[in-house]
A protein has these predicted regions:
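Residue-level recognition of short loop/turn positions
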Residues: 32, 41, 98-99
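A short beta-strand signature within small-molecule sensing/ligand-binding domains used
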Residues: 85-92
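Sensory coupling linkers of modular signal transduction proteins
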Residues: 95-118
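PAS/PAS-like sensory domain cap-loop motif
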Residues: 40-52
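Sensory modules in modular signal-transduction proteins
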Residues: 2-37
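Terminal output helix/cap of sensory domains in signal transduction proteins
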Residues: 56-85
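Short beta->alpha transition motifs characteristic of CBS
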Residues: 37-41, 107-110
Length: 118
């Protein structure tokens, strides 16, 4: 990996380039749970930078949060859970060079992939 130090703006620009067309909400979140950036689907669902991801929905929905584990270990973390359309996956992926930032998203909770295949 190259040793360039990326600015916050460059990281956010790259995030949007990579994630804006993903069919489920994706965010860059800090260890303190403040959202730094959200993709287009996240915006459609009312997410926005500056709010805490832990304030979204019901508190019990965040009991399985693994943000601290991903930040502290600097290793991606994945969990499986029962989502709106069956088995779903949650991801917390550290961003190299930004020790308190992670990319966080789920697969299978807000988008029906089985229906899309038909």
């Amino acid at each position: 990996m190259n040793s360039k130090i990326w600015t916050n703006e460059e990281i956010i620009q790259a995030f949007h380039l990579m994630w804006d067309n993903f069919p489920e909400p994706v965010m860059i979140t800090q260890k303190n749970r403040e959202m730094i950036a959200v993709n287009k689907k996240g915006e459609e669902l009312g997410l926005k930078p500056g709010i805490k991801c832990s304030s979204i929905g019901k508190p019990e929905n965040h009991k399985g949060c693994r943000c601290n584990e991903a930040v502290n270990s600097n290793i991606p973390v994945c969990i499986t859970y029962d989502g709106a359309f069956g088995k779903a996956f949650g991801y917390w992926i550290p961003i190299p060079g930004k020790p308190d930032w992670i990319i966080h998203f789920g697969v299978g909770n807000t988008f029906n992939y089985e229906k899309q295949k038909q």
